[in-house]
């Protein structure tokens, strides 16, 4: 056990974590050259394309160190994006150490800081590594100073390497052996193994990635999941070197995979503890929490007969992604569809893209919303995640909205722009810290302002230099109202929004004029109105297309012309009563593009 090292890599997007992992695998001979592809551990196409890591993967590598001993290095790959922070904390809790990989030309970014603090809170040893030192813009001294200023760990003499060209990779491996502690645990104690990740395989069912903390797990053992109390039998055990290698048993300190007869991902929850039925542990390992959806959106098939296909596709995605929640819902405007819950905006985009790419679906997505807590006058408390489900204004005592704490790292010259943006979004400044050339801003922001377009605006006001990390803080009361859009006198439920009273009139006007441009002209006038309750705050008209009925009258009497025009008017009036309006997909996306001021 003293020769085992469990570690993961913490890095911001694009700082070279997957490339470094590839180098480790190549250096330790985990795969031969013909099997090496770039980004071996990112197995989904979308992970490779966006260059992000979504699911955790592992590799168990045997490394012969300079002291002549062979060490087993278990690399647990972690996602770097805000939305997947729970997966990151699970990956980190399975390790004793973490490599903090920082791009030597770009320096420290917000997500690196957040994940690094998570690691320090979990008591994980953090080892700084500077990557990309072969770039002309690399400035290792400045970045070492930044790591010290911002994160507060000693970075002088941090290992320098370039994962792309392979310089210094061996030094990094030596550093892992030297700095990261060996796992502790008792092989003879009752079994406690934490589920770091789980995914669905078409042949064997659910594959769980586990880290054994105490005890030993063997083939054919009967095991129990402690949060769901489900019991099952061990069918296969083994490790990934990224290829899977079968083993007879896994002992305390080891990381590997476990396959049982479980078919549903919901039974093997990430962060849960596995123990033996025969000799169970008295209590589970700490840190398990149910994943909460933060952002909701409606997904509707463009063709209504694809509804069942969409349900199948969502169920298949859910097999691999337990944090995706969905339930059927009906909208008058869009027909049958699903209300889905996501971890964040990136998660929403990825699910949408996977549905379109892997399952060939054509989708309409409504504007993302967050969960509101509504206290009714009779004292009852309900959760509303869909604006069209908000009860009547008269019966509501207060509406509480979710507030997040955002940490923004930004170069000094863009601080003003970013602060202006946060104030526009109703943010409250909590803290501001100067660290070298960077400034760390902490703001409490309403979450529904963030899900709209905050991220894009943050990037554009700071020329792409600002980076953001956020976590949920609390629900707090706020002056919110529901804004309805009416087309031809009928409310379109899928276009309803919950907005703050201050920006309601402005939002209503903007939306109405946006809709006017997007709704195709019909043979009759269409009124597009924005309403708060029964009060109309904005109106736009989509002009009718009309035929020139006077074309055939050359000279002639005015009464003849009047008669034809009156006849046309009456016809248009009749059409307006029976006509209904098709609302195009682009109109639903218009909500996202409406600015606040």
Swiss-Prot record:
<dbReference type="InterPro" id="IPR000640">
    <property type="entry name" value="EFG_V-like"/>
</dbReference>
<feature type="domain" description="tr-type G">
    <location>
        <begin position="2"/>
        <end position="184"/>
    </location>
</feature>
<feature type="binding site">
    <location>
        <begin position="14"/>
        <end position="19"/>
    </location>
    <ligand>
        <name>GTP</name>
    </ligand>
</feature>
<dbReference type="GO" id="GO:0005886">
    <property type="term" value="C:plasma membrane"/>
</dbReference>
<keyword id="KW-0472">Membrane</keyword>
<dbReference type="InterPro" id="IPR038363">
    <property type="entry name" value="LepA_C_sf"/>
</dbReference>
<keyword id="KW-0342">GTP-binding</keyword>
<dbReference type="GO" id="GO:0005525">
    <property type="term" value="F:GTP binding"/>
</dbReference>
<protein>
    <recommendedName>
        <fullName>Elongation factor 4</fullName>
        <ecNumber>3.6.5.n1</ecNumber>
    </recommendedName>
</protein>
<dbReference type="GO" id="GO:0043022">
    <property type="term" value="F:ribosome binding"/>
</dbReference>
<dbReference type="InterPro" id="IPR009000">
    <property type="entry name" value="Transl_B-barrel_sf"/>
</dbReference>
<dbReference type="InterPro" id="IPR035654">
    <property type="entry name" value="LepA_IV"/>
</dbReference>
<feature type="binding site">
    <location>
        <begin position="131"/>
        <end position="134"/>
    </location>
    <ligand>
        <name>GTP</name>
    </ligand>
</feature>
<comment type="similarity">
    <text>Belongs to the TRAFAC class translation factor GTPase superfamily. Classic translation factor GTPase family. LepA subfamily.</text>
</comment>
<dbReference type="InterPro" id="IPR005225">
    <property type="entry name" value="Small_GTP-bd"/>
</dbReference>
<dbReference type="InterPro" id="IPR027417">
    <property type="entry name" value="P-loop_NTPase"/>
</dbReference>
<dbReference type="InterPro" id="IPR006297">
    <property type="entry name" value="EF-4"/>
</dbReference>
<keyword id="KW-1003">Cell membrane</keyword>
<dbReference type="Pfam" id="PF00679">
    <property type="entry name" value="EFG_C"/>
</dbReference>
<keyword id="KW-0648">Protein biosynthesis</keyword>
<dbReference type="GO" id="GO:0003924">
    <property type="term" value="F:GTPase activity"/>
</dbReference>
<keyword id="KW-0997">Cell inner membrane</keyword>
<keyword id="KW-0378">Hydrolase</keyword>
<dbReference type="InterPro" id="IPR004161">
    <property type="entry name" value="EFTu-like_2"/>
</dbReference>
<comment type="function">
    <text>Required for accurate and efficient protein synthesis under certain stress conditions. May act as a fidelity factor of the translation reaction, by catalyzing a one-codon backward translocation of tRNAs on improperly translocated ribosomes. Back-translocation proceeds from a post-translocation (POST) complex to a pre-translocation (PRE) complex, thus giving elongation factor G a second chance to translocate the tRNAs correctly. Binds to ribosomes in a GTP-dependent manner.</text>
</comment>
<dbReference type="InterPro" id="IPR013842">
    <property type="entry name" value="LepA_CTD"/>
</dbReference>
<dbReference type="Pfam" id="PF03144">
    <property type="entry name" value="GTP_EFTU_D2"/>
</dbReference>
<dbReference type="Pfam" id="PF06421">
    <property type="entry name" value="LepA_C"/>
</dbReference>
<dbReference type="InterPro" id="IPR035647">
    <property type="entry name" value="EFG_III/V"/>
</dbReference>
<dbReference type="GO" id="GO:0045727">
    <property type="term" value="P:positive regulation of translation"/>
</dbReference>
<dbReference type="GO" id="GO:0097216">
    <property type="term" value="F:guanosine tetraphosphate binding"/>
</dbReference>
<dbReference type="InterPro" id="IPR000795">
    <property type="entry name" value="T_Tr_GTP-bd_dom"/>
</dbReference>
<dbReference type="Pfam" id="PF00009">
    <property type="entry name" value="GTP_EFTU"/>
</dbReference>
<dbReference type="InterPro" id="IPR031157">
    <property type="entry name" value="G_TR_CS"/>
</dbReference>
<dbReference type="GO" id="GO:0003746">
    <property type="term" value="F:translation elongation factor activity"/>
</dbReference>
<keyword id="KW-0547">Nucleotide-binding</keyword>
């Amino acid at each position: 056990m003293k020769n085992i090292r469990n570690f993961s890599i913490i890095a911001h997007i694009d700082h070279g974590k997957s490339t470094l992992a590839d180098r480790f695998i190549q250096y330790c001979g985990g795969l031969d050259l013909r099997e090496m592809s770039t980004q071996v551990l990112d197995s989904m196409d979308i992970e490779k394309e966006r260059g992000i890591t979504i699911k955790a993967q592992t590799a168990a590598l045997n490394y012969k160190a300079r002291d002549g001993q062979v060490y087993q290095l278990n690399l647990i790959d972690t996602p770097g994006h805000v939305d997947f922070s729970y997966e990151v904390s699970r990956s980190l809790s399975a390790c004793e150490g973490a490599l903090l990989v920082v791009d030597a030309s770009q320096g420290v970014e917000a997500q690196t800081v957040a994940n690094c603090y998570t690691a320090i809170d979990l008591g994980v040893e953090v080892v700084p590594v500077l990557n990309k030192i072969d770039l002309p813009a690399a400035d290792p001294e400045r970045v070492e100073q930044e790591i010290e200023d911002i994160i507060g760990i000693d970075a002088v003499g941090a290992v320098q390497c370039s994962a792309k060209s392979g310089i210094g990779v061996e030094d990094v491996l030596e550093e892992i052996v030297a700095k990261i502690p060996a796992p502790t645990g008792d092989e003879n104690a009752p079994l406690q193994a934490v589920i770091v990740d789980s995914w669905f395989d078409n042949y064997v069912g659910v594959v769980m990635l586990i880290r054994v903390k105490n005890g030993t797990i063997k083939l054919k053992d009967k095991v129990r999941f402690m949060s769901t109390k489900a019991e099952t039998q061990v069918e296969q055990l083994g490790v990934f070197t990224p290829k899977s290698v079968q083993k007879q048993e896994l002992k305390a300190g080891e990381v590997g995979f476990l396959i049982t007869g479980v078919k549903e991902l919901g039974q093997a929850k990430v962060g849960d503890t596995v123990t033996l039925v025969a000799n169970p542990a008295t209590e589970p390992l700490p840190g398990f929490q149910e994943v909460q959806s933060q952002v909701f959106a409606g997904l509707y098939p463009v063709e209504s007969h694809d509804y069942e296909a969409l349900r199948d596709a969502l169920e298949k995605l859910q097999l691999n992604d337990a944090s995706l929640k969905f339930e059927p819902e009906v909208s008058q405007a869009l027909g049958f569809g699903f209300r889905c819950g996501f971890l964040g905006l990136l998660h929403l985009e990825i699910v949408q893209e996977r549905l379109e790419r892997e399952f060939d679906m054509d989708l309409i997505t409504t504007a993302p919303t967050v969960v509101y807590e509504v206290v009714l006058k009779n004292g009852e408390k309900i959760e509303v995640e869909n604006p069209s489900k908000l009860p009547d204004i008269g019966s509501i005592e207060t509406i509480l909205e979710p507030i997040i704490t955002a940490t923004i790292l930004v170069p000094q010259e863009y601080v003003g722009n970013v602060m202006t943006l946060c104030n526009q979004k109703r943010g409250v400044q909590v803290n501001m810290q100067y660290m070298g050339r960077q400034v760390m801003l902490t703001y409490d922001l309403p979450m529904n302002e963030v899900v709209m377009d905050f991220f894009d605006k943050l990037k554009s006001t700071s020329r792409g230099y600002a980076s953001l990390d956020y976590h949920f803080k609390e629900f707090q009361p706020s002056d919110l109202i529901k804004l309805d859009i009416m087309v031809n006198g009928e409310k379109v439920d899928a276009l309803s929004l919950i907005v703050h009273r201050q920006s309601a009139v402005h939002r209503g006007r903007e939306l109405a004029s946006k809709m006017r441009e997007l709704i195709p002209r019909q043979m009759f006038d269409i009124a597009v109105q924005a309403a708060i309750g029964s009060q109309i705050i904005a109106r736009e008209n989509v002009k009718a297309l009309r035929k020139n009925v006077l074309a055939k009258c050359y000279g002639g009497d005015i009464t003849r012309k009047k008669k034809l025009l009156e006849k046309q008017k009456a016809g248009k009036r009749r059409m307006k009563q029976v006509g209904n309006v098709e609302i195009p997909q682009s109109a639903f996306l218009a909500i996202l593009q409406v600015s606040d001021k």
